[in-house]
């Protein structure tokens, strides 16, 4: 088994954001409470640097991590959108962080890790990578939605989001399994090649797989009838986190839907 080659140029935006989040956690250990405001500036610097790398690459297409991620103009557009949402979240969360005595290091790092998950979802050229991106987005959001630990509504929001998110992930994995059983691969280009033959659509596994995949992503979008969790989670989460979830998660799921169905899952 060969280890896939890593295109460092294509992976640079993901690596910069990851290193920024890890750097925030590291500096948070040593900075005094009075100087922790610099953690937000560090996060914004990492976001702006990542945006600069993305803008400089427009017009170029790269495949990263064994062709499981694709970095093209489509994904770069959504990456810039996610990073803009993260930057605005940092700016509007200053008062929330101070008033609610939120741990700044963990807060800013989790926002960046969630943004990284969004970027992976928009760039996924493989259904397994799509699932990993979705989980990288969801797990930080489970924690962020319950960040106000002293409030019962925040605890309730985190628990509901965690349980329903686990169900949605299970549906998504079942859908991926059905599509793999039909096409013999989880790569979108190979699934597209398989489905290009009309006879492939006679296999019921294809429709089960697509249906379950839609259910999993529809939960993240909050599409009817999978929207019942939204009011409780949005009410219990910190205001800045609610804004981040409203804008970011829907854009990420929409990008994943466009990528999957525009590339492979259409007749």
Locations of regions flagged by a protein language model:
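Alpha-helical transmembrane segments of multi-pass membrane proteins predominantly involved
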Residues: 1-267
């Amino acid at each position: 088994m060969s280890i896939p080659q890593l295109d460092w140029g294509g992976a640079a935006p993901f690596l910069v954001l990851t290193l920024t989040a890890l750097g925030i956690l590291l500096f948070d250990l040593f900075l005094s409470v009075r100087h922790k405001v610099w953690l937000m500036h560090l996060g914004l610097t990492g976001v702006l640097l990542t945006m600069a790398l993305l803008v400089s690459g427009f017009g170029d297409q790269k495949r990263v991590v064994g062709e499981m991620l694709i970095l093209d103009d489509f994904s770069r557009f959504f990456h810039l959108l996610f990073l803009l949402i993260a930057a605005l979240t940092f700016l509007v969360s200053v008062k929330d962080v101070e008033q609610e005595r939120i741990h700044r290091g963990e807060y800013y790092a989790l926002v960046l890790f969630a943004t990284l998950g969004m970027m992976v979802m928009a760039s996924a050229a493989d259904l397994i990578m799509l699932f990993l991106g979705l989980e990288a987005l969801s797990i930080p959001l489970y924690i962020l939605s319950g960040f106000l630990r002293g409030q019962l509504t925040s605890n309730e929001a985190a628990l509901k989001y965690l349980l329903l998110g686990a169900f949605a992930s299970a549906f998504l994995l079942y859908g991926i399994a059905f599509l793999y059983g039909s096409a013999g691969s989880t790569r979108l280009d190979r699934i597209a090649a398989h489905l290009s033959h009309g006879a492939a659509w006679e296999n019921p596994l294809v429709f089960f797989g697509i249906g379950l995949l839609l259910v999993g992503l529809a939960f993240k979008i909050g599409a009817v009838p999978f929207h019942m969790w939204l009011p409780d989670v949005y009410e219990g989460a910190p205001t800045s986190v609610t804004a981040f979830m409203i804008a970011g998660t829907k854009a990420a799921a929409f990008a994943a839907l466009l990528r999957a169905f525009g590339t492979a899952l259409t007749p």
